[in-house]
Regions:
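Structured, solvent-exposed acidic/aromatic patches
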Residues: 1-28, 137-174, 187-200
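An aromatic- and glycine-enriched ligand-binding surface/loop that stacks and positions planar moieties
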Residues: 1-118
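Acidic, mature catalytic/reactive cores of soluble proteins
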Residues: 62, 66-68, 150, 187, ...
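Amphipathic alpha-helical assembly segments
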Residues: 89-159
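A long, glycine-enriched binding/interface module in the latter
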Residues: 193-234
Length: 234
């Protein structure tokens, strides 16, 4: 982070950060689920398009899994049998056109989708591309989509309905600065000054940072859902 608008845990200060409200999909209106602090309070105003989901090399680029929340655990006070709290309750399948594994875009308790650790079906599965589908309509619903997790704020002190976030707002990131420099090199190359490869010293460091490292756990990542009051944005 190069520049941020800083907020404080002092609730008597003027103004708080409400940015966390707008990027999260609805989950609390689904059976087996209820609103909680880590899931945030979903106003669901901003959802990525399919291009944004598909631009990543999902196998090797850690940024996808560290940017989008694709699973929710069952958290209802009295979940219906055979489910218990902590079971996988919601899963978004971010697949590609041509995938023939799924018969529908919405699969509820489908025997075709089993969560291996528990041997149970998953109550709610939302698939981007069902078998035979090539158009981007799998999540054609303003409520259901993998949530951008970068702005989640678990540091809110008044509970899960609190709208007043405490995390800083990032105004300028180092990665964006690198990409602006790379774009400048590309534009110069188009004008005949320099080469396109001059952009690589600015692009490759970002690729190196984003790739999964040796022995890095792919199932563990940080998002703001469990953030302490002083949690930085990364």
């Amino acid at each position: 982070v190069i520049l941020s608008a800083q907020f404080t845990a002092d609730l008597t200060a003027t103004g708080q950060n409400t940015q966390h409200l707008y990027f999260v999909s609805r989950y609390e209106d689904i059976p087996q689920m209820q609103r909680d602090l880590s899931g945030d309070r979903p106003f669901s105003r901003m959802a990525p398009n399919f291009y944004m989901y598909r631009i990543y090399d999902i196998q090797n680029d850690s940024r996808f899994w560290k940017t989008f929340r694709t699973k929710h655990k069952v958290n209802a006070n009295a979940p219906s049998a055979p489910y218990v709290k902590g079971d996988l309750g919601i899963m978004y399948v971010v697949n590609q056109p041509g995938d023939t594994r799924f018969s529908a875009n919405v699969l509820n308790n489908s025997p075709s989708v089993i969560y291996t650790p528990t041997g149970k079906t998953i109550p709610h599965v939302y698939v981007a591309y069902k078998s035979g589908q090539t158009t981007d309509i799998g999540w054609n619903d303003t409520r259901r989509y993998p949530s951008l997790s970068k702005f989640m704020d678990g540091s809110r002190t008044a509970g899960f309905n609190d709208v007043d976030g405490l995390r800083d707002i990032t105004l300028a990131r180092s990665a964006e600065t690198y990409l602006i420099a790379a774009e400048a090199k590309v534009r110069l190359a188009k004008l005949g000054t320099g080469a396109y490869t001059d952009a690589l010293p600015y692009i490759n460091p970002l690729r190196a940072r984003a790739e999964y490292k040796n022995a890095e756990s792919r199932s563990v990542y940080y998002d703001g859902g469990g953030a302490p009051s002083s949690a930085p944005q990364t």
